[in-house]
């Protein structure tokens, strides 16, 4: 029984050490940087589910301004969120995941407010707009842990195509005619004629922005992935193409269209799907729990750029590493950015967990379970940021957000 408990403890507590690229073993800095570069090469291809780099792609000058505009807005959003986390000393993710959250459901704002009003005719075959009132949650904005948008897909037996890729966008407040009016969030491939199902999208960043900036709450847009249609950013219009209509139907949005033949057009469809209205699920950390955490938390020195880059450190610290896609990886297929600050963690962890302070039976058992791993602490990444890239598969532009690509701080573990 004792061995079972020890094995469970060691497996859970030390698994990140074995999986991390760290400085447990002696490595000179040049060798470690080369290993880091090769790890990034494999990481990017793996995240994009590519076996090898794409061979066919357009020249940089051939990329349209609309594609560049969407890339820039997505990249800027990530940077804004990273800056907000840095200035507000965001709670550690591990604490957010440990404590129980309160869940709130917010239904979509209705298209019509009266039961006696016939809903407007079906006039937007290319996209749907969904809006929410989250003002009641504004006082708890800093407690938001996660927000999820859920919409129920209806079975559409009259659909001309059996499968479509739908995309979710956050509608932006336009500053001028040249600025983007939507920001890509996520996409899903759905079966239009299949039995109905719930679709879920992570919209934490968008809802967090709404809670802090009420005037930016313009809702979400559900549209079709449609490269053959022309999108006009200045007025949010799509040039019609009959072969690319959105034929995916949603409960609470398309009820009137789906059941237009029923009696009382304004009521029948809506009542049929009671409980399946598009909604947000907000998960918040209770205020009393957040206050308790903040009052008892000790301030720790962050091994980040602000500390490590201005101090010469032999011990565990963040080390700068800029990856030039063309020079370091020999890649020309990533159009934006040209490179990025990947960084890495390196250095000794001499005081946290020395081998002579551990019980010999624990060390012996751990070495038996994982003989190639180190029983000493390793310098590993703690906080990581995402990277947004623009690349092409053939002539098709793709904008992807790659998680955990930029090391921001380190720790001994």
Curated annotation (Swiss-Prot):
Question: What Pfam families does its record include?
Answer: TGF_beta, TGFb_propeptide
Annotated GO biological process: anatomical structure morphogenesis; positive regulation of cell division; regulation of cell population proliferation; tissue development; transforming growth factor beta receptor signaling pathway
UniProt keywords, alphabetically = Cleavage on pair of basic residues, Disulfide bond, Extracellular matrix, Glycoprotein, Growth factor, Mitogen, Secreted, Signal
Superkingdom in the source lineage: Eukaryota
| One of the record's GO molecular function terms | growth factor activity
Where in the chain are disulfide-linked cysteines found?
308-317, 316-379, 345-410, 349-412
**Keyword S-adenosyl-L-methionine included in the entry's annotation:** no
Q: Which residues are glycosylated?
A: 72, 140, 241
GO cellular component terms, alphabetically, are: extracellular space
Tell me the first and last residues of the signal peptide. 1-19
Where would one find coiled-coil regions in this protein?
none
Q: Which CDD domains match?
A: TGF_beta_TGFB2 (cd19385)
Q: Which family does it belong to?
A: Belongs to the TGF-beta family.
What's the name of the protein? Transforming growth factor beta-2 proprotein
């Amino acid at each position: 029984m004792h061995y079972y408990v020890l094995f469970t403890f060691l497996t859970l507590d030390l698994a990140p050490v074995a999986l991390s690229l760290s400085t447990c073993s002696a490595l000179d800095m040049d060798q470690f940087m080369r290993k880091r570069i090769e790890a990034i090469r494999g990481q990017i291809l793996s995240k994009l589910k590519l076996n090898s780099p794409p061979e066919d792609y357009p020249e940089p000058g051939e990329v349209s301004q609309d594609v560049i505009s969407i890339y820039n807005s997505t990249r800027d959003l990530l940077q804004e969120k990273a800056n907000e986390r840095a200035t507000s000393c965001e709670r550690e993710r591990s604490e957010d995941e440990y404590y129980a959250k309160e869940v709130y459901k917010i239904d979509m704002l209705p298209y019509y407010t009266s039961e006696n009003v016939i809903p407007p005719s079906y006039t937007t075959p290319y996209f749907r707009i969904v809006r929410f009132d989250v003002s009641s949650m504004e006082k708890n904005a800093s407690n938001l842990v996660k927000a999820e948008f859920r919409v129920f897909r209806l079975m559409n037996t009259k659909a001309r195509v059996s499968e479509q890729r739908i995309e979710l966008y956050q509608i932006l407040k336009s500053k001028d005619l040249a600025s983007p009016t939507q920001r890509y969030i996520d996409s899903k491939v759905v079966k239009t004629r299949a039995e109905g199902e719930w679709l879920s999208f992570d919209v934490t960043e968008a809802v967090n922005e709404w809670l802090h900036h009420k005037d930016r709450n313009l809702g979400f847009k559900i549209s079709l992935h449609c490269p053959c249609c022309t999108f006009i950013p200045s007025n949010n219009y799509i040039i019609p193409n009959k072969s690319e209509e959105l034929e995916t139907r949603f409960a609470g949005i398309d009820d009137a269209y789906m059941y237009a033949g029923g009696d009382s057009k304004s009521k029948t469809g809506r009542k049929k799907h009671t409980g399946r209205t598009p909604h947000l699920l907000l998960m918040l950390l209770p205020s009393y729990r957040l206050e308790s955490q903040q009052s008892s938390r000790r301030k720790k020195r962050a091994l980040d750029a602000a500390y490590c880059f201005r101090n010469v450190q032999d011990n565990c610290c963040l080390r700068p590493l800029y990856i030039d896609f063309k020079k370091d990886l020999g890649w020309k297929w990533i159009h934006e950015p040209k490179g990025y600050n990947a960084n890495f963690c390196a250095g000794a962890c001499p005081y946290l967990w020395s081998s002579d302070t551990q019980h010999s039976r624990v060390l012996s058992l751990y070495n038996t379970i994982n003989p190639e791993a180190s029983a000493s602490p390793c310098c590993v990444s703690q906080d990581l940021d995402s990277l947004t890239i623009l690349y092409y598969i053939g002539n098709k532009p793709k904008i992807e957000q790659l998680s955990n690509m930029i090391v921001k701080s380190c720790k001994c573990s």
